Structures are given as C-alpha cells and as structure tokens.
Amino acid sequence: MQALWPLLLSALPALLGASSLFVEKESNGSRICKPAPQWEIDGKTPMKELLGNVVVVALLKASUHFCLTQAARLGDLRDKLANGGLTNISFMVVNEQDSQSRAMYWELKRRTAQDIPVYQQSPLQNDVWEILEGDKDDFLVYDRCGYLTFHIVLPFSFLHYPYIEAAIRATYHKNMCNCSLNANFSISESSDSTKNDPAGENNQRPNSTEPVTAAHHHHHQQHEPHHHHHNPYPNSHKKSGDSDVTGKPKEPPHHSHQEHVHNHR
C-alpha cells in the first residue's frame, strides 16, 4: 500500500475535481482554495486558532449510529498519520445543532479520541453546518493557511475508504492553494480582500471567511471492522466529557450503552 501512495496523491486532486459527487455544487462554482468561513462556538474560533496546521473538520451527528463509528475511527486515522511522520494535523468534530443530537452529545464525545475536540452548538447560535454549507458525514480539509483543499461527501467520506486519508496527505505534502504564512492579514482583512478579489489573485493570504460547499449523495454502508494502529497518544482512546467544547449539555451520570453501529441517513 505504501508504494501506491504517491500515485494516489497525484491522482486525487484531478479525481475529486472531476466529480461533483466529491466537491462542488455546480450552481455555486468552484470554492476550492477559497478562504474558510469564520465560525465560532461560545466565543471560540477554532479555525483561527489552528492557522499553521492542516485542519480536518468532521460534521457528525450524535444521533446517527454510523456517525458514532466514524467518530471512533478518527483517533486511529490521526495516529496512523502521526506514526508516518505527519505532524501538526488537527482534527475536530462539530455535532449537529438539533435537539436529539444535542441530547446525545456525550455519546459522540465518548466515542471520539480524548484529544480530538467535539464542539456542541447551542440552539440559538448560527448553525455551523449551514455556515460551512455541509451535511452529515461531510469532511472538510483545510491547508495551513485556512484554505479549503477538499470537501468530501458521502459515500467517499466513509473512513474505511482511502479518500479522507489521501486528501489529508495531499494537503500536507502539496501546496495546492499557494499557501504562504508570511503574509500578515487578520481574519476580517482576508474576508474583505477576498470579496473584492473574485479572480482569486490574493489567495495567498493565511486567513479567511468565505464558505465552501459540496454536493451531497447519501448511501447506506455496512459497518466494517475497526483496525488498530500503534498509538503515540497513550490516552487518546480514553474518552473525557470535561474538555474541548463549550456550550455543551450537562454530563449524565451514566453513559448510554454502546450500540452496534450501522450507517443510515
């Protein structure tokens, strides 16, 4: 498999760009290599705080059984990349805003590796999923400057497929959006300049506020065995309900039992 990575990395951008299933809504035009939108949860701005890192944002729904499986696999993917020498890659999960998903937040948190933050939206804030123009099981990958490199949707976002890992590796190894961290722009400056620069001439700025989008095709997929890798984070699979998020519900005295997880829409 290692010998196939260079070929897969070189082919992935063309493959994704050629398929509206992967990346874009045709009506909105291409938003790849455009700045990420600014969003916050209880005053925190995760994308701004993580400038300089490759960032992977997973939109997962706590009330969806298969989403819980996806969450459980994130730690293994992160560890696999770290074991391969890929550092400064930050993962995060944003739970859905509806009441059922908020009620099951702690189960999503429990399934996710301890040091991967799980953000819970409050019912009155602007919906982060809408800001990102994303949907359940979408993965958005941003480069070190905060530019979108991939917005991968179902069925390609299933973590037992190679597409998410390949997109992260391509973003890590290739300067796909002419990212330069030498420029000194604030989030608001980057947003204003981008709006006045539809041709993308100034896309080397590190900060951003424009949304990105994807088409969404929903399929059912059977849960597959979970493969384990050596973990450089000794406590990464010990789940904690006391960190990483704001605006979250009170932790219940007992966790709900762990279901056998299947994908559904």
Curated annotation (Swiss-Prot):
It comes from the Eukaryota. Residues 201-211 have a biased composition (Polar residues). The keyword Signal applies. Glycans are attached at N28, N88, N178, N184, N207. It is found in: Secreted. GO terms for molecular function: selenium binding. Its main location: secreted. Pfam families: SelP_N (PF04592). GO terms for cellular component: extracellular region. One of its GO terms (biological process) is selenium compound metabolic process. Residues 188-265 are annotated as: Disordered. SUPFAM superfamilies: Thioredoxin-like. Keywords: Glycoprotein, Secreted, Selenocysteine, Signal. The keyword Signal applies. Residues 1-18 form the signal peptide. PANTHER family: SELENOPROTEIN P, SELENOPROTEIN P2. Might be responsible for some of the extracellular antioxidant defense properties of selenium. This is Selenoprotein Pb. The lineage of its organism: Eukaryota, Metazoa, Chordata, Craniata, Vertebrata. The gene is sepp1b.
